[in-house]
């Protein structure tokens, strides 16, 4: 059985929507809903963050929270800091504001694993048909990510795309845009609430 840990990204400055991870998404705050999607007894699960949570939110996340060693370097810093603490061979990284990312997507990514593959990353297409990746809903070989991610960060860069290029990565076309819905602005949040209503109906 493949050893897979869960890494929930809950850092970021959220300048356009402060406190977004604590906003209600159905019956739970946004980040707690993401945690619930993947919570399993015995599954290694961590939260990467750049701040301590309010007690009421912290109580809904009964897993270790790791403070990012590299502030203002994007999700890469939080992923590297947290993966260094983890033990699972593979890590599924998921954004804390993406409540429609579910174990069904993780199962699809796991099915694409091969001995030589170091990352499986969903690929979508924009309105013009140009492909783009979803690195915050992706599966990574933990040791390989640490090996290739640290040089990128130490070179003064923070782009996950650069790390993925250094990995033996496999992309998986995924057409369902709802899965990757996240929240950066008040209008995003309004759209998410509308989508949640349709999703739960």
Model-derived features with residue positions:
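Nucleotide and nucleotide-moiety/phosphate-recognizing core
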Residues: 2-157, 165-181, 186-200
């Amino acid at each position: 059985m493949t050893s897979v840990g869960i890494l929930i990204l809950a850092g970021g400055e959220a300048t356009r929507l402060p406190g977004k991870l604590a906003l209600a998404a159905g019956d739970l705050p946004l980040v707690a809903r993401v945690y619930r999607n993947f919570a399993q007894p015995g599954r290694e699960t961590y939260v990467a963050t750049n701040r301590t949570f309010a007690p009421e939110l912290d109580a809904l996340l009964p897993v270790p929270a790791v403070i990012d060693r590299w502030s203002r370097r994007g999700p890469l810093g939080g992923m590297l800091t947290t993966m260094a603490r983890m033990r699972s061979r593979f890590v599924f990284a998921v954004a804390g504001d993406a409540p429609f990312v579910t174990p069904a997507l993780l199962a699809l990514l796991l099915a694409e694993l091969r001995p030589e593959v170091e990352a499986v990353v969903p690929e979508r297409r924009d309105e013009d048909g140009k492909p783009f990746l979803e690195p915050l809903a992706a599966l990574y070989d933990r040791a390989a990510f640490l090996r290739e991610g640290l040089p990128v960060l130490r070179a003064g860069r923070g782009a996950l795309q650069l790390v993925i290029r250094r990995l033996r990565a496999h992309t998986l076309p995924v057409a369902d845009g709802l899965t990757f819905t996240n929240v950066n602005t008040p209008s995003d949040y309004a759209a998410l609430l509308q989508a949640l209503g349709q999703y739960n109906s």
